[in-house]
């Protein structure tokens, strides 16, 4: 065991040194990288500032050299156009709020432009009330079959799909001798009694 312990101490010390060296390299390498990026960023900003100030100086020098009438009026026209668009609401309420804008020298409206919905679309007037004679929207009873004249005061059920079943039921009631009401309506007949259940209870 002592031989194993003797080998374990130097190996663990070597691993510890290797780990420390790796950590030191990581810390050391990461710092200059950040500093380098910051330096590059600062250099870029300085170059951009120098270019923009040089452009401003040449522009001001160019304006001072030619004090006569302005030769290129395109920037001024675009500036006037922007002002016109921004302050078009000050012209008056009669002027339209939306306009078709034209591209360049085409003098044709842009194909992608869609005219806005007119304001009277939302300001509907009052609906006119239909005349009293017009009953096209009213409901009415519709018969499936043509009406037939009732025979001897008995209501006819020809209009229903199950009229054959109703006739058979009436005939069965007549043959059994059950009293029919004068009107023949099912509402005035006695309640249904389950005869089979009553017969089974008596047994």
Curated annotation (Swiss-Prot):
Pfam families referenced in this protein's UniProt entry, alphabetically: LAT2
Domain of life: Eukaryota
GO cellular component: membrane raft; plasma membrane
GO MF annotations, alphabetized: SH2 domain binding
Positions of post-translational Phosphoserine modification: 60, 95
Tissue expression remark: Strongly expressed in testis. Expressed in heart, spleen and lung. Present in B-cells and mast cells (at protein level).
One BP term from GO: intracellular signal transduction
InterPro entries: LAT2
Disruption-associated phenotype: Mice exhibit normal T-cell, B-cell and mast cell development and normal humoral response, but have hyperresponsive mast cells.
Keywords: Adaptive immunity, Cell membrane, Immunity, Lipoprotein, Mast cell degranulation, Membrane, Palmitate, Phosphoprotein, Signal-anchor, Transmembrane, Transmembrane helix
UniProt region (Disordered), positions on chain: 171-203
PTM comment text: Phosphorylated on tyrosines following cross-linking of BCR in B-cells, high affinity IgG receptor (FCGR1) in myeloid cells, or high affinity IgE receptor (FCER1) in mast cells; which induces the recruitment of GRB2.
Membrane topology label: Single-pass type III membrane protein
Compartments in which it is found: Cell membrane
Residue spans crossing the bilayer: 7-27
Cytoplasmic side: 28-203
Lipidation (S-palmitoyl cysteine): 26, 29
Key word Cell membrane present: yes
Annotated function: Involved in FCER1 (high affinity immunoglobulin epsilon receptor)-mediated signaling in mast cells. May also be involved in BCR (B-cell antigen receptor)-mediated signaling in B-cells and FCGR1 (high affinity immunoglobulin gamma Fc receptor I)-mediated signaling in myeloid cells. Couples activation of these receptors and their associated kinases with distal intracellular events through the recruitment of GRB2.
This protein's name: Linker for activation of T-cells family member 2
Record gene name: Lat2
């Amino acid at each position: 065991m002592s031989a194993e312990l003797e080998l374990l101490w130097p190996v663990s010390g070597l691993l510890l040194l290797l780990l420390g060296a790796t950590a030191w390299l990581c810390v050391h390498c990461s710092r200059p990288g950040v500093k380098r990026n910051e330096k590059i960023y600062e250099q870029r900003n300085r170059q951009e500032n120098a270019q923009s100030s040089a452009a401003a100086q040449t522009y001001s020098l160019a304006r001072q050299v030619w004090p006569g009438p302005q030769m290129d009026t395109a920037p001024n026209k675009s500036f006037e156009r922007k002002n016109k668009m921004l302050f078009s609401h000050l012209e008056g309420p009669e002027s339209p709020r939306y306009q078709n804008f034209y591209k360049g020298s085409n003098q044709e409206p842009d194909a992608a432009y869609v005219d806005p919905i007119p304001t009277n679309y939302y300001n509907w007037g009052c609906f006119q009330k239909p005349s009293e004679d017009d009953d096209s929207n009213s409901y009415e009873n519709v018969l499936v079959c043509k009406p037939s004249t009732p025979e001897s005061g008995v209501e006819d059920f020809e209009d229903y799909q199950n009229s054959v079943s109703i006739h058979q039921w009436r005939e069965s009631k007549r043959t059994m001798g059950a009293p029919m009401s004068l009107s023949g309506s099912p509402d005035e007949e006695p309640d249904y009694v389950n005869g089979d259940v009553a017969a089974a209870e008596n047994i």
